[in-house]
Amino acid sequence: MSKSIGIDLGTTYSCVGHFSNNRVEIIANDQGNRTTPSYVAFTDTERLIGDAAKNQVAMNPHNTIFDAKRLIGRKFDDPEVQSDMKHWPFKVISKDGKPVLQVEYKGETKTFTPEEISSMVLMKMRETAEAYLGGKVTDAVVTVPAYFNDSQRQATKDAGLIAGLNVLRIINEPTAAAIAYGLDRSNQGESNVLIFDLGGGTFDVSLLTIEEGIFEVKATAGDTHLGGEDFDSRLVNHFIQEFKRKNKKDITGNARAVRRLRTACERAKRTLSSSAQASIEIDSLFEGIDFYTSITRARFEELCADLFRKTMEPVERVLRDSKVDKASVNEIVLVGGSTRIPRVQKLVSDFFNGKEPCKSINPDEAVAYGAAVQAAVLTGDTSEKTQDLLLLDVAPLSMGIETAGGVMTPLIKRNTTIPTKKSEIFSTYSDNQPGVLIQVFEGERARTKDCNLLGKFELSGIPPAPRGVPQIEVTFDVDANGILNVSALEKGTGKTQKITITNDKGRLSKEEIDRMVAEAEKYKAEDEAESGRIQAKNHLESYAYSLRNSLDDPNLKDKVDASDKETVDKAVKETIEWLDSNTTAAKDEFEAKQKELESVANPIMAKIYQAGGAPGGMPGAAPGAAPGAAPGAAPGGDNGPEVEEVD
């Protein structure tokens, strides 16, 4: 059976899991962390993804990209994109009405779409899984906020394609979390479960009924632009004002200072979840001024009060839409790191008249856990836990067409279970009208100008007839990913026209995706070449230094001819000088230099060994050996130290 994974592609952190032997493994990355920052950085020499990218963000704020999820599937002039751009240190420009990210990479100006940046994070998650599972992994379920619209879902699916994944299904984050909660509780009769998912950048609430392995979403609501980052921003603005008051200086123009402050604010926010006060200490924040201050939990709650209160609106809406009263909610499950904030927990508990939320699931890992289970189901896993699992999700937004006068006429109402298909008959608006323009919208407002245009197409060649006579059957078909296909049929002539909404101008074309896939492979190869180059450089450097140290070893001093020592010393000195002035040399240059040094040193070191006095663990004579590995240990010696490579 092929190995499948579930990926929670988050705004700020991502997580990957794999289901086998009736359980889910959440897979740690190469740094040992079970979540990976959704960051990609570009430098003069390399591309960094995950922890390495986030760790250098203060030094390289303009070329370190994060929050791609707040851009994906949106238009450049989206008000939320415009407001986010004000506090991002990286550059977002418009290309064909879509936002693209502009960075300096290897000395050139490059642009990347949000899909490409997300694909790099997905590729990192895929590689994390491959390293652990020991083999190639392509099948994946990727999660999105329940409230993501059609274009955001499609763009996320494209990101998966660019990362070389076969995206089995796009599933909603709260639904995935519900699987994590309900998988072991499937035999407890029917229960109503409310998932409250407040992450780094998005917020969802879903109400599900869980019974014997069937997870049925009754309603969903949310805000695709509310999360932990918004709380950080409130703290950042608060401290920028405080710094201004104390020092009469404004740091907003200095990207590095603002970034260091944001990192400190994120840390303080986490501290405030367990302590009543947090201190902020940043040395030389701006123009040599140290910034030492503190904040109380009460003040933090006051700064974010309106945002916290805002989380209750979708809860009310979900209960209203699903016609369930709050007393009938059996369990409340908190998901997403931001639900650790005590004030948020209290608001939820108070809303449900003091009912305590479930504490048994990990808020950072639940979504990836559920996605991994669903991936196993979709690749044919039949273990006892998954064999009866059935997910019934819903469309988060109503979808319909524009009719005369700019009216939104929904064919599929929000919270309809998907997959679903719905047809309606429409007609012409004026006599002898030769064609109709079918414009597809999503949203809850009565006028299409207040809704989101998904796409449009023309059905032409209608025979002349009085208005209202031709019969045009419009069919909406939403698949299990929540992605829409629309077709129109003119009954008189049998003419049809169809559109997968995603062929709209906002979507990447097949050619663009193919190009991005090829580029992704190229970048990956470049990354691997760069790490090979660094490795060769480090090998040479540590070989040179360990040679020098060996010759200075008191036990060896009297066994080395002065002239031999001088020869090796000179070669080592030349090598180190060459290294200092050729840090960007190619891998084979470093390897050639190592061979050159070995050809001088090996005969001399061999002479010392034959004299029988070498301690274990001398610099190896074998070309390419790890520095410090002895070529056959000295008589009576041990095999030398185990050497660990330090990058």
UniProtKB/Swiss-Prot annotation:
The modification Phosphothreonine is found at T36, T339, T417. Coiled coil: none annotated. It holds the Pfam family HSP70. This is Probable heat shock protein ssa2. The modification N-acetylserine is found at S2. Residues 620-633 have a biased composition (Low complexity). The gene is ssa2. The keyword Acetylation applies. It is found in: Cytoplasm. GO terms for molecular function: ATP binding; ATP hydrolysis activity; ATP-dependent protein folding chaperone; heat shock protein binding; protein folding chaperone; unfolded protein binding.
